[in-house]
């Protein structure tokens, strides 16, 4: 018995010791005690990458693709400039990739171009490809062009973004935005993070306009599309046009449309009425893009000179029209004009407004400008039928027009947008907001958007101007979400504590620091978002909870990264194409050399001199720049004020785990003492 008891005692103690160790191991696994908790700010990005790969990115289900618009990088968005970035080519099949969320776009495009023989230039959209769902302005271009190729590609290697599908080509009559595709890492797989239902949800006329789905279609006519001699006309109606220039903003075009409409200067003849804007006129009128933080646009619209020419279509001879008779006193605003033969008073307006997803024509537009005409020199132009047309030139004086003020004051740490003028809509007459003078009223076009703070001031307002505010993201509900980063995290990436204004100044010019998604399911699902590469997520507690705020430098850096990566890939594409061409030529040379027909160059001619260019150094420089900007840089030191988020809060999981282990040890000792 004694021997047996002596032998059993170590075995019992061994069992108790083993039980104790297993309890500690189980608690450690349950609470995930971070054995390598980040305790300073000298962490290298490569270390963050190791933590991410080891502990966070455990499944591809954590990756979510997001479309980023090129306009966020500050590219020109006017139609003449944008179309120069597109070109036709043959022999390259289109590619389509999907993405799960996109930004709200300020400018989208829709093309319907025909060849001179009447055939279509662009292919029809395949089944499943729908137009980009969130556009403030849709530039719809119709016309003709040579279209020297089967498909229209992006010359800079970007995608054409459709509804959650990105394609390398443009599809006929389908709205798109220019952009690239980036990726998010979620802290854990969330199947419901992005909504999967179609965005063309049914709506009714009484739906809350704060849903934000409000779009304005602006129509253009193009001749010689895709050539260096392309001419664009802004369409007021089917007979009235304005010669388009790159300096025209969408807001200016809408105000110009309103002025032409209300002044009775639209054509009611069978000929075209084409207006030309004085090159000295300042066209920077109206709202800025919704992501701009500086909205201090204050000036008075003084005057505009518009000249028009009449182009007969042969249905009616209008060469005998008399020129307009105008008042000769430049100091008065009274007119005795007789040009109404060329203008209809009741013809429909051009602007088509997509309100709540449905197209509705603007039934009436009101301008506050005072129109006066003064006699100008008359010229004659031979028409297509060799007839002579009198071409009167009118001067539109808008000196009585309103003084548009858009003060947008921001503090260093604010996240809300301040006052912008309230806009009128097609559902009701304009409401005066500016009271600087007795005659000055709101001169914004009825299609111009208004900020969320002011949309309730206008009766029947069907639009919402989306600003970078937390309140707005809540009002957008299911359709939109502005996602930002924690202030401390933005400092880690962009270099110390900086104000919002300073961060934007040091970032890429006109870079959009805010991402306004249109497929995010809810705010709660956005907890712990992080960008790749090397922007997270949660290196043992850095991104623990909450939406990410003040990520100006972070998002701009991501845009630059995507842009540089795209350029590098474009060089790869060019090198691959040239190598392929060179290989084909070599094959032809070998074939012909065997026939002894005088040699390769004698047979192939100038094509014999083609050789692939070496783009290795260019590509290497781009990759090295990306590594230098985003990989090799260390996370800078943060003060106590900046590092509070990465300070005590990162110890919460560790504290819970340690506390649990201590409780388990105490309980174990109590049980052992009670049992034994």
Curated annotation (Swiss-Prot):
Cystine residue pairs: 53-609, 108-135, 121-147, 511-556, 601-608
Signal peptide annotation: 1-32
Residue ranges of the region described as Mucin-like region: 305-485
Effect of residue 88 to A/E: Complete loss of virus capability to enter into host cell
Residue numbers on the Cytoplasmic membrane side: 672-676
Entry comment on modification after translation: The signal peptide region modulates GP's high mannose glycosylation, thereby determining the efficiency of the interactions with DC-SIGN(R). N-glycosylated.
GO biological process: clathrin-dependent endocytosis of virus by host cell; entry receptor-mediated virion attachment to host cell; fusion of virus membrane with host endosome membrane; symbiont entry into host cell; symbiont-mediated killing of host cell; symbiont-mediated suppression of host innate immune response; symbiont-mediated-mediated suppression of host tetherin activity; viral budding from plasma membrane
GO cellular component, one term: host cell plasma membrane
Stretch list, region Fusion peptide: 524-539
Effect annotated for changing residue 601 to S: Induces GP1 secretion. Complete loss of virus capability to enter into host cell
Name this polypeptide is given: Envelope glycoprotein
Organism of origin: Zaire ebolavirus (strain Mayinga-76) (ZEBOV)
Gene coding for it: GP
């Amino acid at each position: 018995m004694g021997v047996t008891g002596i032998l059993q005692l170590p075995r019992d103690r061994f069992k108790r010791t083993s039980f104790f160790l297993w309890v500690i191991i189980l608690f450690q696994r349950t609470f995930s005690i971070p054995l390598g908790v980040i305790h300073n700010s000298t962490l290298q990005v490569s270390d963050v990458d190791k933590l991410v790969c080891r502990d966070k990115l455990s499944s591809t289900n954590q990756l979510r693709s997001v479309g980023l618009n090129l306009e966020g990088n500050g590219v020109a968005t006017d139609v003449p400039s944008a179309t120069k970035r597109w070109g036709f080519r043959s022999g390259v099949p289109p590619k389509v990739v999907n993405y799960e969320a996109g930004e709200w776009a300020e400018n989208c495009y829709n093309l319907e171009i025909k060849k001179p023989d009447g055939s279509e230039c662009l292919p029809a959209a395949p089944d499943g490809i729908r137009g980009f769902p969130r556009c403030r302005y849709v530039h719809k271009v119709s016309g003709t062009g040579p279209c020297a190729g089967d498909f229209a590609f992006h010359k800079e290697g970007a995608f054409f973004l459709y509804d959650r599908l990105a394609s390398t080509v443009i599809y006929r009559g389908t709205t798109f935005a220019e952009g690239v595709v980036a990726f998010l890492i979620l802290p854990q797989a969330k199947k419901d993070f992005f909504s999967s239902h179609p965005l063309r949800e049914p709506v009714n006329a009484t739906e809350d306009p704060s849903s934000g789905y409000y779009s304005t279609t602006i129509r253009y006519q193009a001749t010689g599309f895709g050539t260096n001699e392309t001419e664009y006309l802004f369409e007021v109606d089917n007979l009235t046009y304005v010669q388009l220039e790159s300096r025209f903003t969408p807001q200016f075009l809408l105000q110009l449309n309103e002025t032409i409409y209300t002044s009775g200067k639209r054509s009611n003849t069978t000929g075209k009425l084409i207006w030309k804007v004085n090159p000295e006129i300042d066209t920077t009128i109206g709202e800025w893009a919704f992501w701009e933080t500086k909205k201090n646009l204050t000036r008075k619209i003084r005057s505009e000179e518009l000249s028009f020419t009449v182009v007969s279509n042969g249905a009616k001879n209008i060469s005998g029209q008399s020129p307009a008779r105008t008042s000769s006193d430049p100091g008065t605003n009274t007119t005795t004009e007789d040009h109404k033969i060329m203008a209809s008073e009741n013809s429909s307006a051009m602007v088509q407004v997509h309100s709540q997803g449905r197209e509705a024509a603007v039934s009436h537009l009101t301008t506050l400008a005072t129109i006066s005409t003064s006699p100008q020199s008359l010229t004659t132009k031979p028409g297509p039928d060799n007839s002579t047309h009198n071409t009167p030139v009118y001067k539109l004086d808008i000196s009585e027009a309103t003084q548009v003020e858009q003060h947008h004051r921001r503090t260093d740490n604010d996240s809300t947008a301040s006052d912008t003028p309230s806009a009128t809509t097609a559902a009701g007459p304009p409401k005066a907001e500016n009271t600087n003078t007795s005659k000055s009223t709101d001169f914004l076009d009825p299609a111009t958007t208004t900020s969320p703070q002011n949309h309730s001031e206008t009766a029947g307002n069907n639009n919402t101007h989306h600003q970078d505010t937390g309140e707005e993201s809540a009002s957008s509900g299911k359709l939109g979400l502005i996602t930002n980063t924690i202030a401390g995290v933005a400092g880690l990436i962009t270099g110390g504590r900086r104000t919002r204004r300073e961060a934007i100044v040091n970032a890429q010019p006109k870079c959009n620091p805010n991402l306004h998604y249109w497929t995010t399911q809810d705010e709660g699902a956005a907890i712990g978002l992080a960008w790749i590469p090397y922007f997270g997520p949660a290196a043992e507690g850095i991104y623990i909870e909450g939406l990410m705020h003040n990520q100006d430098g972070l998002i701009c850096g991501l845009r630059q990264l995507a842009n540089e990566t795209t350029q590098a890939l474009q060089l790869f594409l060019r090198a691959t194409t040239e190598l392929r061409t060179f290989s084909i030529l070599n094959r032809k040379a070998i074939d012909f050399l065997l026939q002894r027909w005088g040699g390769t160059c004698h047979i192939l001619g100038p094509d014999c001199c083609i050789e692939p260019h070496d783009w290795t150094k260019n590509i290497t420089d781009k990759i090295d720049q990306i590594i230098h900007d985003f990989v090799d840089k260390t996370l800078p030191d943060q003060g106590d004020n900046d590092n509070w988020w990465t300070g005590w809060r990162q110890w919460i999981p560790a504290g819970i785990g340690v506390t649990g282990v201590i409780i388990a040890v105490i309980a174990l000792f109590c049980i052992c003492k009670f049992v034994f």
